[in-house]
Amino acid sequence: MTEPEVAEFQGLYGPYTVTELLLQKIWGQGLFQQDDLRTCDGRELEILHPGEWNRLGGPDFRRARILLDGKPVSGDVEVHFRQADWRRHGHERDPAYGEVVLHVVLFPPAASEPPARDVRGEALPCFALLDRLHHDLEEYAMDDALSGDLEPRRDRLIERLLALPLKERRERLLGQAWKRWEQKVYFAGLRLKGLDWDDACHHTAMECLGYRGNRGPMLALAARYPLEQLAEERPRPETLVAAVPDTWSRDGLRPANHPVVRLRQYLRWAKKRPDWPERLASEIASWARSGAEPRRPEELLSLAPTFRRDYELPRCHQRLEEFVAAGSVPGSRFTTLVCDGFLPLAAARGEGGLFPYWFYWYPGDAPDVVREIIKTAEITDGRSVSVSNGWIQGVLFSLLDR
């Protein structure tokens, strides 16, 4: 088995790397727009099953099923950064790649570039991911890095933090949280470039309810079933699951996070609050009118003891939970949706002064190792400085070693 290819790109805060393994995950988990797909030469493409991920030698995915111009085709799929990688790796001479029926690449090939060919000399259909991605490639790379094993980085980060005085520790994580916030707002802005406000909110909510393993099928459903349609037709959650078969992951899911359970919650939400994106916009806008002013990140530390009380965060949270979402999504998942979805979207739309809310908002879902780092580095004391979303995000950004 050869080592996966690695490419470097320029991100918002410096270079980042992407491996072919990430591209394979994007393909295998369906983390891209799948409506009205076309191959690079213009043929209609429909993905019935992406194939079984092959981590051994040979093609990256086995036994995929697709439709090309409506005709069923079965075989293997190979994933590369560029179409030229097929020839560079010598696949056109390797019988192990003789059953490949689709070449998936990140970058679309130039019109003058010759197609990849199999061992029989037949041109392979090519599909380019880049223009179909739900997010900026950097966001995929960050999510992938944070979904891996963070334990090896834990001790190194704790050591770096404890080498600083407490005030500098907090300032360091505050600065990292600010960078994380700017990235989230930037990525939300990219989503708003492709979708209007209602659709962007709809896609964001369904993606968040899908967790890491089921973001792809949830986003596919969001594209296929607009919010208005879900509110009016009220399909059964089982019907929605069946609409994108062979794409759901149930490995390691707690019962509360099963796709049917989360879809049932969102359908209840859509039924009770079909206008929830407008409610969200008006509610968050009212916070700015209530007197919150944009503040520089370093000014926030002095607000820690009283921010939640002074800016009525309990009331704000309750309003979002009830006025916007009708109490349909309980627990930390809704809190995560506020921090990862609602607030960045509102900021990207132009609402100012939201970073303090985002930083001092209640903590949502987070890996245990992150909470352990916050505790061991004595960032919070349980009195004047409590655990909040901002401290969690600062640690997460620090773990990326950017």
Residue ranges and their predicted role:
Residues 74-82, 103-105:
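Active-site ExK catalytic segment of metal-dependent nucleases
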